[in-house]
A protein has these predicted regions:
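PLP-dependent amino-acid enzyme catalytic core
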Residues: 1-295
Length: 295
């Protein structure tokens, strides 16, 4: 009988080609915690253990819009740490429940303060109760997880040819890590950033509410080098949600709304470049959005 630890199942996700399209997508929703954020949770926690900033008995506190919180709770609890996740109250009930079921503590902040309010509260909790904050928006091990693992997997699975890479911007780690690797291997690759309509930080818009959870937090993350981005595409809530539903119906892919946003944007690039190999990621699962406007 062969068996492995749950953390050994993070990464090495399959690559899916959308039917009758020149778009390939890495199925990150198949990670054990249900999202691409499992990768950075493992990377950041193990780096903190290695450098001694995280030691047995310490607490982990992290501000997040949801998926990073799930990943950190999964990895942190598997390693025996107490985990407290701080998130805006408007995130889906499923995300909140998953964190609690995995054994994490949950602190909610006003939705109109966006992720910035969660960051402020997390900093306050660390100051008052101790522990460490992994700081996904600043942590280089976020980028490293994608540069050293996600990107090489994608490049190999794609047969060493990718003409464009499309990714939404949440913490910035995916587009920075994968984009940097792809530029190194193909200097002509086009890196496409996806942001919610009218609240794009890259375009200088003010923060605002939208329904594409996981991207569009209203600021440019410290770990993102904006010079890496070649194209910025804005997607409406309606297009993101509609594409997410269509992916389930036409490709049997049960993904979240940021996946719909990514695929919608990839299709805009495909219209202009039908001969290109266009890669993207499907960051998380549909089930954590059934209480929102996805159904």
């Amino acid at each position: 009988m062969q068996s492995c630890d749950i953390l050994d199942l993070i990464g090495n996700t399959p690559l899916v080609r959308l039917r009758n399209e020149n778009i390939i997508a890495k199925a990150e929703f198949l990670n054990p915690g249900g999202s691409i954020k499992d990768r950075i949770a493992l990377s950041m926690i193990e780096a903190a253990e290695h450098d001694g900033t995280l030691r047995p008995g310490m607490k982990i506190v992290e501000p997040t819009s949801g998926n990073t919180g799930i990943g950190i709770t999964l990895v942190g609890r598997a390693k025996g740490y107490e985990v407290t996740i701080v998130m805006p109250e408007g995130m889906s009930e499923e995300r909140k429940n998953i964190i609690k079921v995995l054994g994490g503590n949950l602190v909610l902040t006003p939705d109109n303060e966006s992720i910035a309010g969660a960051v402020k509260m997390a900093e306050q909790l660390v100051a008052e109760t101790g522990g460490i904050m992994l700081q996904q928006f600043k942590n280089p091990n976020n980028v490293r997880a994608h540069y050293e693992y996600t990107a090489p997997e994608l490049w190999r699975q794609a047969g060493d040819r990718i003409d464009a890479f499309v990714s939404g911007i949440g913490s910035g780690g995916t587009i920075q890590g994968v984009g940097t690797f792809l530029k190194k291997n193909n200097p002509e690759v086009t890196i496409v950033a996806v942001e919610p309509k009218n609240v794009s930080a890259l375009l200088g818009h003010e923060p605002g509410l939208h329904q594409i959870q996981g991207i569009g937090d209203g600021f440019i993350p410290d770990i993102l080098d904006v010079a890496l981005v070649d194209v910025i595409l804005e997607v409406t809530d309606e297009d993101a949600i509609g594409t997410t539903r269509e992916l389930a119906a036409s490709n049997s892919l049960l993904c979240g709304t940021s996946s719909g946003a990514n695929v919608w944007a990839a299709r805009q690039i495909a219209k202009e470049h039908p001969d290109w190999v266009i890669a993207t990621v499907l960051p998380d699962r549909a089930e954590r959005y059934f209480s929102t406007g996805l159904l």
